[in-house]
A protein has these predicted regions:
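Small-molecule-sensing regulatory modules
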Residues: 2-44, 49-50, 57, 141-336
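Ordered, amphipathic secondary-structure segments that act as subunit-interaction surfaces
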Residues: 75, 82-85, 207-214
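Paired acidic/hydrophobic, glycine-rich loop segments that form the ligand-binding mouth/hinge
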Residues: 73, 78-83, 168-173
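Short, structured active-site "lid" loops
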Residues: 53-78
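Short, well-ordered beta-strand segments
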Residues: 9-11, 80, 98, 129, ...
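Short acidic active-site motifs
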Residues: 67-68, 118, 157-158
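A conserved helix-loop-strand patch within extracytoplasmic ligand-binding domains
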Residues: 84-85, 93-145
Length: 336
């Protein structure tokens, strides 16, 4: 059998959004490797099963990836597609991140109930629903007159709860709504200065096993996203945060992206070579502006900082993330 006729099993969470995101990879492979056999396997994760608590109240790491990681280890799947913001800071030693997709719109958005056309019509007797303290803390500054409550479930479930009248509005990621074709539900975009997005928001992470050749994905992965991921996650890691912590970072670039999504590299998945490390093919960018948000639990104080750095590799991006974290830690010392 030719190399591009090998079978590739993609693992995904079973929500509609997760499946749509996995289908972006599936569609790419089918377009450029039409003889490859591809199967999509879905499963519930721990984070999908516990819906009565906020994510930061559940505790633990990898709430949305543990089951997918085990499927990779067991050989039941060959590739996992994750929302990068759900991926723990520490990657298991026996697995690797192959690369990152081009970034969808990273901003958070306000969604009003159906029939409500303008923010001026919001009923502030009802809470605004959010799924994270990061969003709540930043939204409190924008809507000081509002109360806030947790809203869990997939995107469609949250929209249903909103339209049933449980909330005056909810805050979601623009990327999820766009990937589901629900842009019409967006009532207001928050700029990345008003509400700094979760680290990795809008980026997909492709995870696989060591010892497997994933070079067929060379044309899908983005060098810019690899650097952004390293910078944003480097900031979070340096401050000891995880995917449920009230901490966030966002990188913006001058210069062109190096994503190869428009065309395949001509390689194929051999399933026998060495695994490929994240961040391959990084391009040259003029500069990166990295913004960070951190909530200090000890003093209940919010910190925001930003830096600009010249970066061309994930390692340089990660160093910028650590530099930004160091600035916030120095500022924190003066208030404790």
């Amino acid at each position: 059998m030719a190399q591009d006729e090998k079978k590739l099993i993609i693992g995904s969470r079973e929500s509609l959004l997760a499946v749509r995101q996995s289908e972006l990879v599936l569609d790419y492979l089918r377009k450029y490797f039409p003889h490859m056999q591809i199967e999509l396997v879905t499963m519930k994760t721990t984070g999908d099963k516990i819906l009565h608590k906020r994510l930061d109240e559940i505790g633990g790491k990898g709430l949305f990836v543990k089951e997918l990681d085990q499927a990779l280890r067991d050989g039941r799947t060959d590739l996992s597609v994750h929302s990068l913001k759900d991926l723990p800071a520490e990657i298991p030693e026996d697995l690797l991140v192959i690369g990152f997709s081009g970034r969808e719109d990273p901003r958070d958005v306000l969604v009003l109930p159906e029939g409500i056309a303008d923010i001026s019509e919001m009923d502030f007797s009802k809470p605004i629903g959010t799924s994270s303290r990061r969003r709540t803390l930043q939204a409190q500054e924008l809507f000081p007159q509002a109360s806030f409550e947790s809203v869990r479930g997939n995107v469609l479930t949250r929209l249903r709860k909103l339209d049933e009248g449980q909330y005056s509005a909810i805050i979601l990621a623009a990327a999820g709504l766009r990937r589901l074709g629900l842009e019409n539900r967006i009532s207001r975009f928050f700029s990345t200065e008003e509400m700094i997005p979760s680290a990795g928001q809008g980026i997909l992470a492709l995870q696989g096993r060591k010892g497997v050749d994933y070079s067929c994905l060379d044309g899908f992965v983005s060098a810019r996203s690899a650097i952004a991921a390293a910078a944003e996650r480097g900031f979070v890691s340096a401050l000891g945060g995880g995917c449920t912590s009230p901490i966030s970072a966002h990188a913006e670039f001058d210069g062109a992206d190096e994503t190869g999504v428009s065309g395949a590299s001509g390689a194929s998945c051999g399933f026998g070579g060495d695994g490929l490390a994240a961040g391959r093919g990084a391009g040259a960018f003029n500069s990166m502006t990295l913004s960070g948000f951190y909530f200090d639990e000890e003093t209940c104080r919010i910190y925001r900082k930003k830096i600009t750095a010249k970066v061309s590799t994930p390692e340089e991006g990660r160093a910028a993330g650590r530099e930004l974290a160091a600035l916030i830690m120095a500022d924190m010392k003066t208030h404790r």
